[in-house]
């Protein structure tokens, strides 16, 4: 058993409490983006492959609707809430997550129910925010990396256009800026679930899927009915049976 597989149970512990309804709905734990960040990414790192993480990140888009197109190697490092002192100011910056391999660095700022920290001067001529401050971390500490990017991770309904436009205008061109939605992860895990993975991984993936469902962090697929979806069958003794087949389930009704 390799180190990542051996750590599955340990990495899974922090969300078991919530999956079994042990957390009050009004608890600050439920609304904490730090808890969400550590639960999701803390558990993804224990999968034997980075394929789920990479497929999730590939769903991030920039202002031209181009997808994030860098995949991390197996030698990926996760840095949670690491503190960085600026080399030009006295400010300390603490990104939610930094992903790093030999050639790439990615800073992920995770939001759940809070907003991006923005600062304006009195006459609003000067503007900065968390993402811009994090770009100085890349310049100061990761300038040797070939691929340098920032992802803003939010709920699907988060209004990002204005703040990201302001950010892109002031961000160095060599640093990519992307937007990603928490809801995109669910389908990535469902695809991975179909692969030939170990029992431990299946259990972990299932737990994360349940967690995302509880938090309502998945897209509603909806139901679309057309007359072509219905089939009628006549059975003896005046029993009629019809079925409607949808993408995700089959609904049946029997009338006698």
Spans of model-derived segments:
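Charged, terminal alpha-helix-loop-beta segments
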Residues: 1-256
